[in-house]
């Protein structure tokens, strides 16, 4: 796959008939992050994406209209009390290895940027591993790195 022009891609909403191709992409993403339960996670995320009451959405990149997706962007709104506004959190961004370097990521991010502009969500925010050099090179070209530090506070299992 040698497409390099982001405008040559079709980026649209994930559809129910995309399940199998999406699942391959999602498992690739989970493998990259060394998930220990990929099948269970993939099933839950698919249910969220197909449930209109959930906020999580997915844009996919296709090399041509109607073709199976080769990239995904899971995203959702989040409120910003400090600013009194709504922004977009990009939870997952993944492109199949054979489609990397072809403009698919640029196309996904451009489509997400347009969607967020249309909805009044500002900015689009995401995190990545410090060691993810290839992705960070793209992100550094398209976005601004913040000085925010991310923390996770474990909460443990639910009380009986």
What are these regions (language model features)?
Residues 1-17, 159-160:
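Conserved N-terminal entry element of GNAT/NAT acetyltransferase domains
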Residues 19, 23-48:
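Conserved GNAT-fold acetyl-CoA-binding loop/helix
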Residues 48-60, 89:
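A short helix-loop-beta-strand connector motif used in the catalytic cores of GNAT acetyltransferases and
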Residues 60, 68-77:
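Conserved beta-strand in the GNAT
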Residues 68, 78-90, 100, 146-147:
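A conserved beta-turn-beta hairpin within the catalytic core of GNAT-like acetyltransferases
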Residues 99-111:
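Conserved acetyl-CoA pyrophosphate-binding loop and the N-cap/start of the following alpha-helix
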Residues 106, 130-149, 153:
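Conserved active-site alpha-helix within GNAT-family acetyltransferase domains
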Residues 117-127:
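Conserved GNAT acetyl-CoA-binding A-motif
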